[in-house]
Design a protein with these regions (language model features):
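Short, charged/polar "capping" segments at the starts of alpha-helices
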Residues: 37-45, 135-138, 162-165, 249-250, ...
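Active-site and donor-binding regions of nucleotide-sugar-utilizing enzymes
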Residues: 4-182, 350
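Catalytic binding pocket for nucleotide-activated donors in carbohydrate/polymer assembly enzymes
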Residues: 350-413, 417
Length: 426
């Protein structure tokens, strides 16, 4: 029997590597993930070459280039494969969905695996995952079916949302939970202490692990940053804005006639809500970039954000962080930071700087803007519980403004401190 890691994000893949090379180094394992961003096919190949996992399964979760995409690209004036190809794709997808209803979970999964071959669902006695998509539920359901319910189903840290009580409402029974900072989970004191296990923190002196994750995620020094006296990349006197991947309103929705607006009513409503988050996020970025006091502003693009976001960011003075498509945690393991300010809506990447590393690091001031961006459009109760707990643990460096004016005031004070520190270091 062996472990199976079902990963929806690169951060979960990083955590699977960490667990498999520490707690489970004497146990066989497979890894399953999806084509939800560009480059995941190459990522799967690099994972396979490490030999850490017996099998790497890659599930085709890419957007269907069917009739909907054909209409969208035609309205936007973009190239496409033509109506006939789009029709065939849509028909094939309809057949797949219909057959899946009759053939069950095993077919639904295996029919779209593009690397690794067919899964042996009976091979596992432990699964590590998070119940966030129907695909995960299907996979776990089939495993429980073929193991007569004997397989342990564990939840694996996937960022801040894993610390919310809502993750306990799953479509399958939970055995254990693996987290970096269990005490920050808002359900920790509700009878879960004995079932939450700490993921080993990443040791900055562990060069073997760094070599593994650098290879897997294809981390390279592109020459943008200097090194410190210990041989680490060094980011000094920087303001970093962490992107999150809400999409702006697609161009084709801005030019629809009344008939098409009626036909596409539901997707229009969805895009309208998401684009509101995008616009507020960009408003916060403009404040960050336009009031930097002459300091360098860097944007860390979300791994799943399209490169088309770059042009919008660069309307303000900024540079884009290198290695855009790798987890920030990999970059942090290769880098030291001095006199930084980090700003985001609610990105996990800031929290992991303080949560997942074993060594003591500079206490970087961090500003979380979710109360401003989500206000009126999204409930943020569980975000708030987590980030308030995070703030209580790091009261001198975590800031959660409630208004744009408060953000501007906090930011101005931090810029003054940054400039004073730079002068003192000269």
């Amino acid at each position: 029997m062996k472990n199976l890691y079902i990963c929806l994000t690169d951060f979960q893949i990083l955590n699977a590597l960490n667990l498999q090379l520490s707690k489970f180094k004497n146990k066989k394992a497979d890894l399953f993930f999806i084509t939800n961003k560009e480059g995941n096919e190459q990522l799967a190949e690099r994972l396979a070459t490490t030999g850490i996992f017996e099998k790497i399964y890659l599930f085709n979760n890419s957007r269907i280039q069917g009739l909907h995409q054909y209409v969208r690209s035609t309205v936007e004036g973009k190239t496409n494969k033509g109506f006939a190809a789009a029709l065939v794709t849509s028909v094939n997808e309809a057949v797949y969905k219909l057959r899946s209803k009759f053939s069950g979970e095993a077919y639904r999964i295996n029919a779209k695996i593009v690397l690794g071959g067919k899964m042996d669902f009976a091979a596992y006695d432990e699964v590590f995952c998070l119940d966030k998509r129907s695909l995960v539920v299907d996979c776990v359901t089939q495993i429980l079916k073929e193991t007569s319910g004997k397989c342990k189903i564990n939840l694996l840290d996937e960022g801040t949302s894993t610390y919310w009580r809502s993750i306990l409402k799953t479509n399958f029974p939970i055995s254990d939970i693996y987290l970096y900072a269990p005490e920050l989970a808002n359900y920790y004191a509700e009878g879960w202490q004995e079932r939450i296990y700490k993921i080993p923190k990443i040791d900055y002196s562990d060069e073997k692990f760094r070599a593994v994750i650098n290879k897997v995620f294809d981390f390279k020094d592109d020459g943008n940053y200097p090194y410190d006296d210990k041989g680490s990349l060094f980011l000094k006197d920087k303001i970093i804005f962490f992107d999150q991947n809400w999409d702006p309103m697609p161009e084709y929705f801005k030019h629809l006639n009344k008939f098409m607006m009626l036909l596409l009513h539901n997707p229009y409503k969805k895009h309208k809500k998401e684009s509101a988050f995008y616009e507020r996020k960009m408003q916060m970025f403009r404040i960050t970039a336009d009031n930097s006091g002459g300091n360098d502003v860097i944007v860390k693009l979300h791994p799943r954000s399209p490169l088309s976001f770059v042009a919008d960011y660069q309307k303000s003075k900024c540079t884009m962080a290198p290695n855009l498509k790798i987890p920030w945690e990999v970059f942090m393991d290769n880098c030291r930071f001095n006199n930084n300010i980090w700003v985001t809506v609610s990105s996990t990447a800031l929290c992991t700087y303080k949560m997942i590393f074993a060594d003591s690091r500079e206490d970087i001031p961090m500003i979380f803007l979710y109360k401003i961006v989500y206000d009126g459009n999204k409930s943020y109760q569980e975000d708030d519980q987590f980030f308030k707990g995070f703030q209580q643990k790091y009261p001198q460096s975590v800031f959660i403004p409630e208004t744009t004016e408060e953000f501007a005031q906090i930011y101005k004070k931090l810029i003054t401190k940054m400039n004073d520190k730079r002068k003192d270091n000269k």
